[in-house]
């Protein structure tokens, strides 16, 4: 018998990266700025603690949850509220384009095991999301906001920053979760960039190639025909021919792509 059917509180599942929020102050931080005009996407609502705070403020909440064992408790948490729609689905495979009305905000305590790829996917595939405010591991937050030349700066930071303006809004103690994670967490806020490059897909391929081997100079990570053009383009951007990928800003990658593309 499942925990939900037996009447017991469902235990967090490690394989799903579940760490349920239990602190009201932290919930208010995540829900900050929401109004009744907002349609909110929440991923990983779990037992519904944060969901209740979101529903108090937003016009509508789309809650996407993969774990059937927590659904009874989630439904009890939101009670008779008519502005919460629960979608039982895998967040990495869910068709966000089918949500109606489409969400303009993300507010969530994201499952730790899917947070990195999920945030990038939402930025790439759900253009209606104008702002995101969510909790993740501090390590992931630092990777999102890393600056060129820092140890956390990589392809992920470049792509996130091409599509949004991320910042660490608040650092979170492990004690606000059940169970407490062994890592530190943070609330991240992202504002979608309206000036994201139209040739993002091509830039993304260049970024992936450029960071393939961090120890190599950037041109050596590119296919043969592009190496010479990359050296010339780097010089035009103020970088030497021995520049490595982590030295270039997101804007540099856009300019480099446009200079070396056929």
UniProtKB/Swiss-Prot annotation:
Family annotation (InterPro entries): KsgA/Erm, rRNA_Ade_diMease-like_C, rRNA_Ade_Mease_Trfase_CS, rRNA_Ade_methylase_Trfase_N, rRNA_adenine_dimethylase, SAM-dependent_MTases_sf
Source superkingdom: Bacteria
Function: Specifically dimethylates two adjacent adenosines (A1518 and A1519) in the loop of a conserved hairpin near the 3'-end of 16S rRNA in the 30S particle. May play a critical role in biogenesis of 30S subunits.
Residues engaged in binding S-adenosyl-L-methionine: 19, 21, 44, 65, 90, 109
Ranges for region Disordered: 218-246
Subcellular localization(s) per the UniProt record: Cytoplasm
Reactions listed under catalytic activity: adenosine(1518)/adenosine(1519) in 16S rRNA + 4 S-adenosyl-L-methionine = N(6)-dimethyladenosine(1518)/N(6)-dimethyladenosine(1519) in 16S rRNA + 4 S-adenosyl-L-homocysteine + 4 H(+)
GO MF annotations, alphabetized: 16S rRNA (adenine(1518)-N(6)/adenine(1519)-N(6))-dimethyltransferase activity; RNA binding
NCBIfam families, A to Z: ksgA
Keywords: Cytoplasm, Methyltransferase, RNA-binding, rRNA processing, S-adenosyl-L-methionine, Transferase
Family: Belongs to the class I-like SAM-binding methyltransferase superfamily. rRNA adenine N(6)-methyltransferase family. RsmA subfamily.
Listed Pfam families: RrnaAD
EC number(s) per entry: 2.1.1.182
Enzyme class: transferase
This protein's name: Ribosomal RNA small subunit methyltransferase A
Coiled coil: none
Cellular component, GO, one term: cytosol
Species classification: Bacteria, Bacillati, Actinomycetota, Rubrobacteria, Rubrobacterales
């Amino acid at each position: 018998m499942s925990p939900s059917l037996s009447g017991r509180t469902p235990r967090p599942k490690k394989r799903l990266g579940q760490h349920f929020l239990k602190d009201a102050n932290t919930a208010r931080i995540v829900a900050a700025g929401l109004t009744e005009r907002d349609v909110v996407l929440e991923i990983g609502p779990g037992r519904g603690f944060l969901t209740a705070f979101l529903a108090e403020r937003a016009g509508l909440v789309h809650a996407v949850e993969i774990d059937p064992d927590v659904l009874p408790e989630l439904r009890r948490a939101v009670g008779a509220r008519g502005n919460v729609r629960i979608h039982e689905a895998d967040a990495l495979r869910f068709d966000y384009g089918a949500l109606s009305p489409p969400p303009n905000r993300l507010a969530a305590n994201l499952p730790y095991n899917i947070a990195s790829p999920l945030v990038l996917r939402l930025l790439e595939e759900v253009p209606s999301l104008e702002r995101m405010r969510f909790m993740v591991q501090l390590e992931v937050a630092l990777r999102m906001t890393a600056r060129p030349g820092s140890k956390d700066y990589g392809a992920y930071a470049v792509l996130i920053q091409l599509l949004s303006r991320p910042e660490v809004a608040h650092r979170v103690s492990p004690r606000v979760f059940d169970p407490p994670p062994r890592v530190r967490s943070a609330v991240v806020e992202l504002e979608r960039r309206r000036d994201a490059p139209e040739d993002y897909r091509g830039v993304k391929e260049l970024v992936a190639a450029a960071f393939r081997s961090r120890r190599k100079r950037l041109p050596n990570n590119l296919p043969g025909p592009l190496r010479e053009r990359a050296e010339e383009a780097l010089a035009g951007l103020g970088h030497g021919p021995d520049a490595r990928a982590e030295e270039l800003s997101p804007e540099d990658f856009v300019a480099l792509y446009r200079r070396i593309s056929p």
